[in-house]
Amino acid sequence: MKVFGDGGLKGRTLSPIVAVTQIPLLQMQIAFAIGLLGVYIGWRGIIAKMTGFYDMAGAFKYLLFGIVSGMVFAVASDEMILQFAVLESRLNIIHAFIISLLIGASESALVMFLLGRPKVVTLRASTPYGWTLGLGMGAMFTSVLIVRLFDPLLGSDFSGFDIISILIGLSIAVIACLGNALISTYQGVGVLNSKRFKTFYTSTFSRGILILGLIATLWQPLLIIFFATLIFYYWPTAQQNGYPLV
């Protein structure tokens, strides 16, 4: 199915409330469970190997920060890009990308603020906290996307509740959680190395690509291969050094 048209993004006019209420409660719970599965993978892959070298309570607190703020940004991405641009075809790809950059800049600004707090910097905890913060943000973005994917009215060839959509959802969960975690930890490295503004611009662009790209995977799942390549390029570094991108 063609996602991007000449004048805008192709899709069906549909309000966010209608889209959500089309799927049963069980399917919505499954969608959020898949999103949280990405948190488990990221936690077991990195945080669980840092035992004794970081503040567990602080890491968990930043995970909650990520979940709460991530839902706000996920809803913004859903209504301003997926709903307004894709389903209602009111924006072209350039305008949609600009909006994704604005959302990405907002995310990066919040991450820079949270990881740059004096107490966090003093503890040298900006990197592990950034990892858990990103996991929470990615989980909520994933959950909203999967709720959309399970909706048969989405207009995608892969929408609806079946094994294919579940597999796509699982792939999105891994990419969104690990992708956001890598980007947030990269900002944490910038905070500790006094390069927070340089990493802010890079992370904003990266988040913009990730947001728009993962939305597009609802129609073009092969994009998962592109993002998976980037994620797993940095994954060995994260496993070897304990912190990603360090």
Segments and roles (model prediction):
Residues 3, 8-246:
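Hydrophobic alpha-helical segments at protein termini of multi-pass membrane proteins
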